[in-house]
From Swiss-Prot:
Topology with respect to the bilayer: Peripheral membrane protein
Coiled-coil region(s): none
Purpose: Produces ATP from ADP in the presence of a proton gradient across the membrane.
The protein's name: ATP synthase epsilon chain
Protein family (similarity comment): Belongs to the ATPase epsilon chain family.
Localization per Swiss-Prot or TrEMBL: Cell inner membrane
Known partners and oligomeric status: F-type ATPases have 2 components, CF(1) - the catalytic core - and CF(0) - the membrane proton channel. CF(1) has five subunits: alpha(3), beta(3), gamma(1), delta(1), epsilon(1). CF(0) has three main subunits: a, b and c.
Record keywords, A-Z: ATP synthesis, Cell inner membrane, Cell membrane, CF(1), Hydrogen ion transport, Ion transport, Membrane, Transport
Pfam families: ATP-synt_DE (PF00401), ATP-synt_DE_N (PF02823)
Primary localisation category: membrane
Organism: Citrifermentans bemidjiense (strain ATCC BAA-1014 / DSM 16622 / JCM 12645 / Bem) (Geobacter bemidjiensis)
GO molecular function, one term: proton-transporting ATP synthase activity, rotational mechanism
Gene3D superfamilies found in the cross-reference section: ATP synthase delta/epsilon subunit, C-terminal domain (1.20.5.440), F0F1 ATP synthase delta/epsilon subunit, N-terminal (2.60.15.10)
Presence of the UniProt keyword Transcription regulation in the record: no
Amino acid sequence: MAEKLKVELVTPYKKVLSEEVDEITATGALGEFGVLPGHAPFLTSLKIGELAYRKDGVSHHMALNWGYFEVENDTVTVLVETAEKADEIDLERAKAALGRAETELKGLTPEDKNFRIYEAALERALIRVQVAGKAARR
């Protein structure tokens, strides 16, 4: 059994992460899950949420926007629409997006065609604010 997991995280635009890590957690369609070296093969979809990994005793956090997560032979492959490292998130911009989404949602009902769009925008902004806050506390 390997002592580390090889993680490759890719968006349609670039490779965001290529590291050997001790453990990794993410938010799947059915909730949060964690993976350690030696994990059985596994494939799941990801929803808007946080990905966290520990490397050499240090925790790292990222905000993700939809994708897929696969584990095979101590290799983790993460394919996502977008990914932002905690220390790269502009907290003021994320808070502004959160405010805009909240304002738009106040005037809509679940039956409105734009409701789900702003609901997803709100969820993305919340995750970005939470993850950015974790970078500030390092």
